[in-house]
């Protein structure tokens, strides 16, 4: 296991859904529910869903801050093909 600490996102403890170990290096990382993070910004900061999603996408989900960078889970809606979800959520490069 890595000696680096697992990093957290300030103000989003209620969106933590677990921890996992990132390979290689066996670094423990915190796992967040992306939709819960959006809901926190909507409730706390009065953002719309779209504004919160854009803010998190630009400022948080795409950031790399070292080996302890958290993981953000985006749930695939039931019945939606994974490839379609990836394209809609992350663009054509996914």
Segment roles from a protein language model:
Residues 1-94:
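C-terminal alpha-helical interaction appendages
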């Amino acid at each position: 296991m890595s000696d680096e600490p697992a990093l957290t996102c300030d103000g989003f403890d209620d969106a933590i859904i677990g921890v996992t170990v990132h390979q290689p290096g066996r670094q423990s990382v915190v796992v967040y529910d992306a939709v819960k993070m959006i809901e926190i910004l909507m409730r706390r900061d009065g953002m719309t869903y779209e504004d919160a999603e854009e803010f998190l996408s630009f400022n948080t989900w795409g950031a790399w801050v070292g080996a302890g960078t958290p993981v953000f889970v985006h749930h695939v809606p039931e019945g939606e093909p994974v490839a379609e979800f990836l394209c809609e959520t992350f663009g054509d490069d996914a």
